[in-house]
């Protein structure tokens, strides 16, 4: 087989090398969840530029086990060179941590107005949001009227002054002005949106819910656990609800981060997976009889080390990757269009790489998904003259694949 397997991060976590702070303040480290404690690329990106006396704040507001989640990340930071005595846990949560029976973390719900907790934010050079449920974080940091609490104002002031803001999973979802709060792809494409104050039992299933975020990233939407939870469809549906100029989505894989340098106008992928970039600014979409369709979407993917210009979404592949232009692929096989557990599992990167751009005989790829009632969607990915891929380290960079979504009805009958 031509392509090697991506080497995983192994062994003890590396100590991050301290470097002088750059002249580009206010970076964002937006992690897709399930970040390994040994993932030096992600954790070192978060602490990059910290001086020996600089402090870090950890905000566990999204977690259902706030104290445990905070202490876990304190240990991770310590493994990457940040002494625990330089780390402040911000007491902000909305549910009790059952692992600490002597402490009721639900009592921290109002601490976004507490001077002692706000002071932890004000002295931090880097601030991290743990994972959990993003609605918990916004419930704690936004007032009932949607305005910012004093702690959120302090967070925005620190970010403007150069502090790094990072977060994983739910901590990534809150980064934008509008955030994805609930839903899965198939339901998002076949059911109407639900109100941001509606009750829904799970974050990962059901109809799409959008809600106000915290607004650190002034562009588009972020989705996380992206490839493993098949969230391309829900991201496309969510983007259709934004103003046209804002319709840029970033889908961050697990154990991976998008590192955004707002001052320089660039973003870089770091970690074990990739970051999908979905451009829907020129897309045409419709919702008819609760079925979503869209055409004119453009899909790209950053592999680790790739850089993205935020101004024009141009991708610069990391050094050492081999470029693959249309018609120049290694493979020559008919791509399968089915899905399900009887077929080999294939992520987005391999579908767009092995089956499309790195495949000399394929310029179009279809994938169909459907539920038990037969309501389904067809994804169509097409190579264009602007498309190219790059391969290195077992990872594909993908540039400018045309993408469309069409509702379908599927009937399944037993063979005679």
Regions found by a protein language model. Name each.
Residues 116, 120, 147-162:
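Catalytic-core regions built around general acid/base machinery
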Residues 23-37, 93-106:
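Acidic/glycine-enriched edge-of-secondary-structure segments
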Residues 128-131, 154-155, 159-179:
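Catalytic nucleophile loop
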Residues 63-64, 72, 84-117:
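Functional beta-strand-loop-alpha-helix junction segments that form "active/interaction loops"
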Residues 24-54, 58-59, 63-72, 77-82, ...:
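C-terminal and late-domain segments of enzyme folds
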Residues 18-20:
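N-terminal signal peptide c-region/cleavage motif recognized by signal peptidases
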Residues 1-9:
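Bacterial N-terminal signal peptides that target proteins for export
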Residues 134-148:
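Glycine/threonine-rich flexible loop motifs
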């Amino acid at each position: 087989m031509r392509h090697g397997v991506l080497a995983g991060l192994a062994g003890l976590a590396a100590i991050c090398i301290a470097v002088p702070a750059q002249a580009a303040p206010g970076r964002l480290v937006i992690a897709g969840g399930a970040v390994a404690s040994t993932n030096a690329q992600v954790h070192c990106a978060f602490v990059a530029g910290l001086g020996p006396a600089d402090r870090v704040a950890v905000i566990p507001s999204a977690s259902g086990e706030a104290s445990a989640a905070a202490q876990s990340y304190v240990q991770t930071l310590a493994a990457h060179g940040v002494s625990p005595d330089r780390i402040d846990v911000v007491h902000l949560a909305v549910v009790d941590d059952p692992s600490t029976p002597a402490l009721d973390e639900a009592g921290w719900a109002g601490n976004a107005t507490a001077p002692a907790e706000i002071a932890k934010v004000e002295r931090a050079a880097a601030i991290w949001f743990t994972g959990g449920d993003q609605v918990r974080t916004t419930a704690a940091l936004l007032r009932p009227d949607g305005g910012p609490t004093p702690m959120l104002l302090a967070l925005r002031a620190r970010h403007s002054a150069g502090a790094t803001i990072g977060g994983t999973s739910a901590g990534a979802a809150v980064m934008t002005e509008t955030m994805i709060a609930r839903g899965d792809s198939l339901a998002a494409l076949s059911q109407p949106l639900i109100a941001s104050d509606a009750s829904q039992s799970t974050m990962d299933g059901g109809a799409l819910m959008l809600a106000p975020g915290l607004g650190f990233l002034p562009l588009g939407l972020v989705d996380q656990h992206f490839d493993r939870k098949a969230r391309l469809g829900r991201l496309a549906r969510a983007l259709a609800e934004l103003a046209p100029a804002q319709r840029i989505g970033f889908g961050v894989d697990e154990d991976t981060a998008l590192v955004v340098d707002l001052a320089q106008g660039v973003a870089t992928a770091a970690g074990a997976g990739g970051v999908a970039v979905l451009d829907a600014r020129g897309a045409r979409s419709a919702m008819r009889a609760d079925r979503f369709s869209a055409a004119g979407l453009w899909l790209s993917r950053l592999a680790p080390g790739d850089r993205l210009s935020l101004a024009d979404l141009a991708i610069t592949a990391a050094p050492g990757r081999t470029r693959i232009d249309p018609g120049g692929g290694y493979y020559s096989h008919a791509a399968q269009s089915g899905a399900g557990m009887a077929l080999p599992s294939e992520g987005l990167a391999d579908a767009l790489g092995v089956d499309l751009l790195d495949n000399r005989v394929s310029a179009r790829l279809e994938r169909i998904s459907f539920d038990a009632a037969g309501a389904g969607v067809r994804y169509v990915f097409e190579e264009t003259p602007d498309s190219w891929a790059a391969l290195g380290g077992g990872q594909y960079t993908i540039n400018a694949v045309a993408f469309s979504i069409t509702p379908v009805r599927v009937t399944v009958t037993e063979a005679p």
